[in-house]
């Protein structure tokens, strides 16, 4: 059973289905039943579980036999997490539990897939569903023999993390009243269900609460976990630098949206003892714990954390001490390792120190500032567990980007990394690093079918997502929720080049930034460089003489296709952009295509498009196992599976460092670069997705 064909892909997939329902019940649309022995029955069904399982098996279309193992993992730590608790990787106790479970899954010998399935079924029966889902996903992604098993869309298995809690009561009613084969009308999710525009931060709710944006963050942290016993799971190429770059781009994109709404750029949270004016009421319920996510009132403070149940005992003094040590490392350009020796500080080390991942050079000295900051923010309402309250949305990778404070915290993280980039130990780029002799960009433009030149068009779209895979304890059949989100008309870049040298390759780098700052003044480059959002990056052959490059927006190296954010789990592989599932599991991490372009304004927001054709001799990477890239999607944010990051330059190049000579973007432009004024215009209407199920129109 070592090949991953047919059943061996289908059966592991079923462990994602209806995560809060026990495995005794049928799974999947075909009502498949796992044949459980007493050892594999959940503890609460110990008396009659096998009998119930057999009874369900009588109606099943498929019965899945399970191999009986000589021994099962003890899960001494992981079994302590109650099945109805919420799970957060940011809590030390939960990290230890996750490490224990991932070890058990990774330690099953390769190609012993019956053993692997039985081990996972045992874990699924005995462990918290959210803990299981995370560990199972990481294991599937990192085992060579399971990488063809698709990681299920988290918004469909745990829909309560992505949408208004009132939806689920209505959804259960629909499944109970309407038979499975009757078309069901979608449940409409209103656009403004968490607040009103009296709260100015709410103007950005469409962006912060977007399903695709939150799925991106969840999937990125699945691909780049910060802790594991097997170092190789964490120690991926340039991982710390990617932590900086991906989050830097989130802040830049968020700031673009803020400017479109006449708001200032996000203010970093740097005084950790001052009140936090931003309140947040998530209006989400956890279907696992059957409780609402705790809100945060305005003007609450961080407080020292002492929650033994979570393994948290940290003071603000600890955080400030770690911060001083990080600042000293930045100001001296040196980092002190755990053994007392010192090494040069680079951005990759700084990212791992700040987060902190297990790759941090010295956890004792530099702590875990980023992760603990999330915990401080998540427990302001109950820092000592006096009220038995769980954490706020900011401590869960799938919900954290909903909270306005996420951006204030990450603005501080980004500012700390930028101080390193601006320090004397990181030299600005020289002209020879920026130029590409013989390559001259003569013009650049963007075109939209039937639209005005150099104008990008955004609009609202409403789409349906099927909730039935996450609706535990209800009848089968599709139940759709319809929600509205920002989208953009497809466009293409047209770049004209004169190459006076011989034929060669080049890397095309495309960025965009608002033309004016909050005061409607022209930016200084020192500020605008942090506002440039990466739109695309690709390698292109150039002929001698005149060349014209056209590139579609849907081919962006930053994004994943729309279908991957809102895909149904069953019809796999119909997307021509996806070569195989293994790459999807990795490349499923990526910025959502529908959020590629900032919202703009109805009057038209002024942006600048920047295009650079860099010298490929300085860009190219020698990949292990050759340069055959299996997955081109979203490599800018997510790297490539089992390979080096596909660009030798610093992430964010050429804007990751200040310029020593240019004071504004016009001064920065060399012959191999071009700048083009463009307009982003919002059409404030809602269009139906033509792919919505016919029953739902």
Swiss-Prot record:
GO-annotated cellular components: extracellular region
UniProt source species: Spodoptera litura (Asian cotton leafworm)
S-S bonds: 587-631, 589-638
Subunit structure: Heterodimer.
Family per record: Belongs to the tyrosinase family.
Gene: PPO1
Upregulating conditions: Expression increases 2.6-fold 6 hours after the challenge and 10.19-fold after 18 hours. No significant up-regulation in response to injury.
Cofactor, how bound (note): Binds 2 copper ions per subunit.
Protein name: Phenoloxidase 1
